[in-house]
């Protein structure tokens, strides 16, 4: 049996329809793209480690140029990388990067899958990565995806050796080879589905002077796209905004990648012209003939001419059991006839007035359990049969003329992302929905069936809500389902300084419907919470309220304790957040996290009455910890940097990557140096090479590829134990560097003026000792500090030693500090 004739299950989840179609996927141009896909029997799987690794040019060429069915599988969602646009970190960042990747993959014309495993932070070595990722389980996931996708060709982005650099990359290359070898063996991972043997395995990441088998030039111009495949791919890469990928313009001309044939079931070769050389995959004759007939009559100004041939192809695909091919024929027919189904939530109040059709409006965006709303399905064909479906048994009442009254069940499934883990230290997610998919399925959808040339053709659309975006433009997104009240407590951990008395804890409430109720804190026995509860009343969805409680732990509190916020309304309770993750140009996703804060009781001292200024950079939660110390903190905006009395602050902190995102900081940097000269303490946290322009009081050099120490347990040597940052108010030893998370630090100096004093030394296994991590210098009457330790990772999780060291760091600015 030819591999192309085997049934391939449709793997598009409902949410795959949430992305608004690109111009190249609509109308006559979209039809031509679909015809290319219908003509190709080949399936390709591209294995990468995390978002933005992909060979975007080759994927675009294969999919949009050759019509191959391309799936990209990413082992992780990039949870622990840097975030250039928001303060989302860990799992929230993974959600954001999933949205970015879906938009990028749409540009390439590819589908997207994920394994269960998480990005645990930058890793320099294969050995460290495999200590964190359970090798056999990652291979199991890759095997499962191979068996579900049934590719003819597997393309590994990485080779599996030191040439790949990053430890995650090396592991991805190695594990892709192991999964390729295991997928066709029914004795291996029998729980991962029926065996499927791909026919070829290639690896990427090669240069012209390396060993290679074939080249792929994505710099070929495609008149259908109006650009080269590489240029089209670059537009997709720009969706990875949180990583700053794809920012450079792709110029016309050759864009060549080199691939090496690692293994083959159809014979090896020194040189090839295509990934599909020597493959005999073919489509049923009736299907191929129908596609050829549709191609023969294709016309941009009369795309409907191909409909009879497409209907014949649809019939042939169904007869052959090729469900995926049948779905492509249905898409082609819809494109040829200009058919589009929309299924929209109607506004609560009818739109009236002469210009009502020109005014943007919003509708209910999130349905709460038991909520009733009205919706309309339209396709523009009177002969269409429309059905409304859901996963959870929504009540559906037809009101005629495509209008429906819908009621969400009391136990409606939440639209929060369906991959979750108990802790950011867990290496794997559990899936509570479609395994390995990018986003959860839509809550409700409509299907419209029409008859074309004797064949039923079905279109599908999720129920969408209308909203107004950041540019005041009306847009749509699938209706979400969530609780009536979202409850959150901010940071997952906080510090309580023993002996400091009570503290205020703010509970954030947001309504998803009109609702009245109360909110309380559940704390351990012996803890005092005032008041016992507080009432709230929301008149409509989208209202927010901060409720403050005063929490007093017992004097003998120690270790970690959980404090939980619970909202009660009617007979229901909510003790979790329901928060939107969104960025302009992307879809919307929702995350739900327990409204629990762990409180770490610590013996930690900090200077009294500290006044701290903070220059926020790309976004972090360091200010929260400063406030937990009892210090007052102001965020310094452009106006403050330009004209405020900076001498009002004992210490000023510059946030992560601030010199990359705050041009006002660069413009007013001299004022900060004058602040130091007059007695202030300025602490600059890790910054990217934009900082490599001598913004300090004395020269330094970072280079465009600065060093970092990624092993969070790498040994640390204190070089200047007598320095005041180590002597008080907390006595710091090397033990305070134990139990750090994810990494030590990033973006170290490689050279510096002798007036800077290096304070610590550290290195990963195999790395030269690094002393450019933490530099301090006297300047005039003050002190200038560059500290590239990963405070933005340690402090939100209240890592004890990091908290103690940071308390000393900000206390350097105290008027009575020992160094003054």
Where are these regions (language model features)?
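A glycine-rich, often tryptophan-bearing local segment used as a flexible ligand/cofactor-contacting loop or short
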Residues: 657-738
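Proline/serine/threonine-rich low-complexity linkers at boundaries of modular beta-sandwich domains
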Residues: 328-346, 354-355, 476-485
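Metal-dependent de-N-acetylase/amidase catalytic core
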Residues: 18-45, 125-129, 135-344
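Catalytic beta-strand/loop cores that center a nucleophilic Ser/Cys/Thr
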Residues: 704-798, 817
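Long beta-sheet-rich domains in secretory-pathway and surface-associated proteins
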Residues: 355-602, 606-608
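Aromatic-Pro/Gly-enriched surface loop or interdomain linker
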Residues: 573-655, 688, 709, 793, ...
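N-terminal signal peptide c-region/cleavage motif recognized by signal peptidases
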Residues: 13-15
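Active-site rim/loop-helix segments in enzyme catalytic domains that contact anionic ligands
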Residues: 19-148, 170, 177-181
